[in-house]
Protein backbone atom coordinates (compact mmCIF):
# COMPACT_ATOMS: atom_id res chain seq x y z
CA UNK A 1 0.00 0.00 0.00
CA UNK A 2 1.31 3.44 -0.94
CA UNK A 3 0.13 6.44 1.08
CA UNK A 4 0.67 10.03 -0.08
CA UNK A 5 0.03 13.26 1.79
CA UNK A 6 -2.03 15.72 -0.27
CA UNK A 7 -2.22 19.53 -0.28
CA UNK A 8 -4.62 19.39 2.69
CA UNK A 9 -3.07 18.40 5.99
CA UNK A 10 -4.11 14.88 6.96
CA UNK A 11 -5.91 14.10 3.70
CA UNK A 12 -4.22 10.98 2.37
CA UNK A 13 -4.29 9.36 -1.04
CA UNK A 14 -4.07 5.60 -0.74
CA UNK A 15 -2.98 3.19 -3.41
CA UNK A 16 -3.69 -0.32 -2.16
CA UNK A 17 -1.62 -3.26 -3.26
CA UNK A 18 -3.59 -5.10 -5.91
CA UNK A 19 -3.08 -8.85 -6.34
CA UNK A 20 -4.12 -9.67 -9.88
CA UNK A 21 -4.26 -13.14 -11.40
CA UNK A 22 -6.12 -14.91 -14.17
CA UNK A 23 -9.31 -14.94 -12.07
CA UNK A 24 -9.37 -11.18 -11.59
CA UNK A 25 -7.95 -9.27 -8.63
CA UNK A 26 -7.88 -9.11 -4.85
CA UNK A 27 -7.02 -6.31 -2.46
CA UNK A 28 -7.53 -5.43 1.18
CA UNK A 29 -9.82 -2.39 1.03
CA UNK A 30 -9.42 -1.75 4.75
CA UNK A 31 -7.51 -3.41 7.50
CA UNK A 32 -7.38 -1.97 10.99
CA UNK A 33 -3.68 -2.42 11.80
CA UNK A 34 -2.23 -1.28 8.45
CA UNK A 35 -4.57 1.70 8.05
CA UNK A 36 -4.05 2.81 11.66
CA UNK A 37 -0.30 2.67 11.08
CA UNK A 38 -0.80 4.92 8.01
CA UNK A 39 -2.56 7.52 10.16
CA UNK A 40 -6.14 6.60 9.38
CA UNK A 41 -7.67 6.65 12.80
CA UNK A 42 -10.84 4.69 13.36
CA UNK A 43 -12.87 3.23 14.71
CA UNK A 44 -15.32 3.15 11.82
CA UNK A 45 -18.99 2.91 12.74
CA UNK A 46 -20.88 3.29 9.45
CA UNK A 47 -20.44 2.20 5.82
CA UNK A 48 -22.23 4.04 3.00
CA UNK A 49 -22.88 3.30 -0.66
CA UNK A 50 -24.35 5.78 -3.13
CA UNK A 51 -24.93 5.59 -6.88
CA UNK A 52 -24.83 8.66 -9.09
CA UNK A 53 -25.34 9.47 -12.74
CA UNK A 54 -22.80 11.40 -14.79
CA UNK A 55 -22.64 15.07 -13.82
CA UNK A 56 -24.09 14.53 -10.34
CA UNK A 57 -22.19 16.57 -7.77
CA UNK A 58 -22.69 15.83 -4.07
CA UNK A 59 -21.25 18.19 -1.46
CA UNK A 60 -19.52 19.97 0.10
CA UNK A 61 -20.72 18.19 3.26
CA UNK A 62 -19.54 18.01 6.85
CA UNK A 63 -20.97 17.59 10.36
CA UNK A 64 -20.18 20.50 12.67
CA UNK A 65 -20.65 18.21 15.67
CA UNK A 66 -19.87 14.51 15.50
CA UNK A 67 -17.45 15.23 12.60
CA UNK A 68 -16.87 12.23 10.39
CA UNK A 69 -13.59 10.87 9.06
CA UNK A 70 -14.30 9.17 5.72
CA UNK A 71 -12.37 6.51 3.82
CA UNK A 72 -13.80 6.81 0.31
CA UNK A 73 -13.51 5.03 -3.05
CA UNK A 74 -15.36 4.50 -6.30
CA UNK A 75 -16.13 0.82 -6.83
CA UNK A 76 -17.78 1.41 -10.20
CA UNK A 77 -17.09 4.17 -12.67
CA UNK A 78 -15.10 7.29 -11.80
CA UNK A 79 -15.49 10.40 -9.67
CA UNK A 80 -13.52 13.57 -8.96
CA UNK A 81 -13.32 13.55 -5.20
CA UNK A 82 -12.64 16.69 -3.16
CA UNK A 83 -11.73 17.47 0.44
CA UNK A 84 -11.73 21.03 1.81
CA UNK A 85 -9.91 22.00 5.00
CA UNK A 86 -12.42 23.63 7.38
CA UNK A 87 -10.15 23.71 10.47
CA UNK A 88 -9.21 27.32 11.30
CA UNK A 89 -6.12 26.13 13.17
CA UNK A 90 -4.83 24.08 10.23
CA UNK A 91 -1.94 25.29 8.05
CA UNK A 92 -4.01 24.34 5.00
CA UNK A 93 -7.24 26.02 6.23
CA UNK A 94 -9.47 26.93 3.27
CA UNK A 95 -7.49 24.83 0.79
CA UNK A 96 -8.88 21.96 -1.24
CA UNK A 97 -7.48 18.83 -2.81
CA UNK A 98 -9.11 16.88 -5.64
CA UNK A 99 -8.36 13.40 -7.02
CA UNK A 100 -9.88 11.09 -9.56
CA UNK A 101 -10.97 7.86 -7.89
CA UNK A 102 -12.15 5.09 -10.14
CA UNK A 103 -12.83 1.41 -10.44
CA UNK A 104 -9.75 1.27 -12.68
CA UNK A 105 -7.19 3.12 -10.53
CA UNK A 106 -8.68 1.76 -7.25
CA UNK A 107 -7.37 4.79 -5.35
CA UNK A 108 -8.92 5.74 -2.03
CA UNK A 109 -8.96 9.03 -0.17
CA UNK A 110 -8.84 9.45 3.60
CA UNK A 111 -10.76 12.60 4.55
CA UNK A 112 -10.17 13.28 8.26
CA UNK A 113 -12.71 14.88 10.62
CA UNK A 114 -12.58 18.65 10.13
CA UNK A 115 -12.72 18.54 6.34
CA UNK A 116 -15.66 19.05 4.02
CA UNK A 117 -16.16 16.43 1.34
CA UNK A 118 -17.82 16.20 -2.05
CA UNK A 119 -17.50 14.56 -5.44
CA UNK A 120 -18.45 14.91 -9.08
CA UNK A 121 -19.43 11.84 -11.10
CA UNK A 122 -17.30 11.55 -14.25
CA UNK A 123 -18.56 8.26 -15.68
CA UNK A 124 -22.06 7.42 -16.95
CA UNK A 125 -22.77 5.97 -13.53
CA UNK A 126 -20.62 5.62 -10.42
CA UNK A 127 -20.92 3.59 -7.25
CA UNK A 128 -19.28 5.35 -4.32
CA UNK A 129 -18.53 3.51 -1.09
CA UNK A 130 -17.07 4.82 2.12
CA UNK A 131 -16.45 4.10 5.77
CA UNK A 132 -17.22 6.74 8.40
CA UNK A 133 -15.84 7.26 11.91
CA UNK A 134 -19.06 8.83 13.26
CA UNK A 135 -22.73 8.21 12.67
CA UNK A 136 -24.81 10.31 10.29
CA UNK A 137 -26.31 13.18 12.31
CA UNK A 138 -28.53 15.27 10.01
CA UNK A 139 -29.07 17.91 12.68
CA UNK A 140 -25.32 18.63 12.60
CA UNK A 141 -24.90 18.38 8.84
CA UNK A 142 -23.75 21.49 7.00
CA UNK A 143 -23.25 22.17 3.29
CA UNK A 144 -20.83 24.66 1.78
CA UNK A 145 -21.59 25.91 -1.71
CA UNK A 146 -19.79 23.65 -4.21
CA UNK A 147 -18.66 26.60 -6.38
CA UNK A 148 -17.79 29.09 -3.67
CA UNK A 149 -15.21 31.43 -5.23
CA UNK A 150 -13.24 31.78 -1.98
CA UNK A 151 -12.45 28.07 -2.12
CA UNK A 152 -12.26 27.87 -5.92
CA UNK A 153 -12.48 24.14 -6.45
CA UNK A 154 -11.41 23.22 -9.98
CA UNK A 155 -14.22 20.81 -10.78
CA UNK A 156 -13.61 19.09 -14.16
CA UNK A 157 -17.09 20.06 -15.30
CA UNK A 158 -18.62 19.86 -18.72
CA UNK A 159 -21.72 22.06 -18.23
CA UNK A 160 -23.75 22.51 -15.09
CA UNK A 161 -23.67 19.81 -12.43
CA UNK A 162 -26.75 18.01 -11.23
CA UNK A 163 -27.37 18.98 -7.59
CA UNK A 164 -29.78 18.14 -4.78
CA UNK A 165 -31.92 21.02 -3.52
CA UNK A 166 -29.81 21.06 -0.36
CA UNK A 167 -26.55 21.29 -2.28
CA UNK A 168 -27.86 24.01 -4.60
CA UNK A 169 -28.48 26.09 -1.48
CA UNK A 170 -25.12 25.52 0.15
CA UNK A 171 -23.74 28.24 2.40
CA UNK A 172 -20.86 30.46 1.22
CA UNK A 173 -17.54 29.59 2.86
CA UNK A 174 -17.28 33.08 4.40
CA UNK A 175 -20.60 32.57 6.25
CA UNK A 176 -20.19 28.92 7.16
CA UNK A 177 -19.90 27.52 10.65
CA UNK A 178 -16.41 26.02 10.74
CA UNK A 179 -14.13 24.12 13.11
CA UNK A 180 -11.72 25.83 15.54
C1 LIG B 1 -25.51 10.72 4.36
C2 LIG B 1 -26.74 9.91 4.77
C3 LIG B 1 -27.96 10.12 4.16
N1 LIG B 1 -29.05 9.40 4.54
C4 LIG B 1 -30.32 9.64 3.86
C5 LIG B 1 -30.84 11.06 3.97
C6 LIG B 1 -31.55 11.27 2.64
O1 LIG B 1 -32.89 10.78 2.74
C7 LIG B 1 -30.78 10.39 1.68
C8 LIG B 1 -29.81 11.15 0.79
O2 LIG B 1 -29.00 11.97 1.65
P1 LIG B 1 -28.01 13.06 1.06
O3 LIG B 1 -28.69 13.81 -0.02
O4 LIG B 1 -27.47 13.84 2.20
O5 LIG B 1 -26.88 12.14 0.43
P2 LIG B 1 -25.48 12.57 -0.15
O6 LIG B 1 -25.61 13.86 -0.87
O7 LIG B 1 -24.92 11.42 -0.89
O8 LIG B 1 -24.63 12.83 1.17
C9 LIG B 1 -23.31 12.37 1.25
O9 LIG B 1 -22.51 13.23 0.41
C10 LIG B 1 -21.12 12.94 0.44
C11 LIG B 1 -20.43 13.98 -0.41
C12 LIG B 1 -20.58 12.83 1.80
O10 LIG B 1 -19.45 13.22 2.10
C13 LIG B 1 -21.39 12.06 2.77
O11 LIG B 1 -20.92 12.18 4.09
C14 LIG B 1 -22.84 12.45 2.70
O12 LIG B 1 -22.99 13.77 3.21
O13 LIG B 1 -30.12 9.41 2.46
C15 LIG B 1 -28.96 8.44 5.52
O14 LIG B 1 -29.97 7.77 5.86
N2 LIG B 1 -27.76 8.21 6.13
C16 LIG B 1 -26.65 8.91 5.78
O15 LIG B 1 -25.53 8.64 6.36
Enumerate the predicted regions with their spans.
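Short beta-strand His + acidic residue motifs that chelate non-heme Fe in jelly-roll/DSBH
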Residues: 109, 117-122
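Non-catalytic, conserved peripheral segments adjacent to functional cores
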Residues: 1-107, 123-125, 130-180
Amino acid sequence: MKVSQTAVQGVLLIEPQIHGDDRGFFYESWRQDVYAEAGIAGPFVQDNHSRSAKGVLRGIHYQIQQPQGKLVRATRGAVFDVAVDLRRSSPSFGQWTGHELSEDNRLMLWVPPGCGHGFLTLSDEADFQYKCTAYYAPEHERTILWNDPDIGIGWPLDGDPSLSGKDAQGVPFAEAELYP
